[in-house]
Design a protein with these regions (language model features):
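Enzymes that bind and transform nitrogen-containing heteroaromatic metabolites
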Residues: 1-154
Length: 154
């Protein structure tokens, strides 16, 4: 899906939090390999932040989930190394995005907003420090989703 002239999944590597990969906390259910079925949409390495080690999981289509237990900076360093000249995308969830915003490691924020109220959950832009979001281009989307892109100014 093009956003700002680029595909969401065109990054050379992705980073996500544990909850974006798997439900539950604690030790892993090794039968669980993500929400996406046999062929996730990433088609690149995905670094999953976690406190619980797990062997990497290789899926169809070029997606490999690599589990990182030593923090956001370590995950970013590994992702940058494999991405080369391509972008590294933070795939979420909100707490992971907030950690990277607070650390000053996000340059551009792409939000895909669906008109669904889910109830309680993590708040985006919570405890991220003093940042300004500059809109890049006009919002796009459909009645089911709005795509918004911002430059992060520190």
């Amino acid at each position: 899906m093009p956003v700002g002239g680029r595909r969401i999944t065109a990054a050379g590597a992705f980073i996500m939090g544990r909850n974006m990969f798997s439900p539950g906390r604690g030790t892993w259910d090794l039968d669980w390999n993500g929400w996406w079925g046999d062929e996730p949409p990433y088609h690149a390495p995905v670094f999953v932040l976690t406190h619980h080690p797990r062997e990497q999981v290789t899926m169809k289509g070029g997606t490999t989930f690599i589990f990182v237990t030593d923090g956001i900076e370590a995950a970013m360093a590994q992702a940058r190394e494999v991405a080369g000249e391509r972008d590294v995308a933070i795939a979420g969830g909100a707490e992971t995005v907030n950690q990277y915003l607070a650390a000053g490691l996000i340059d551009e924020l792409r939000l895909h907003v669906a008109p669904v109220i889910l109830g309680k959950g993590e708040r985006l832009l919570h405890n991220v420090g003093d940042i300004t979001l500059e809109p890049l281009g006009a919002p796009s989307g459909t009645r089911l989703v709005s795509h918004l892109t911002y430059r992060v100014i520190r």
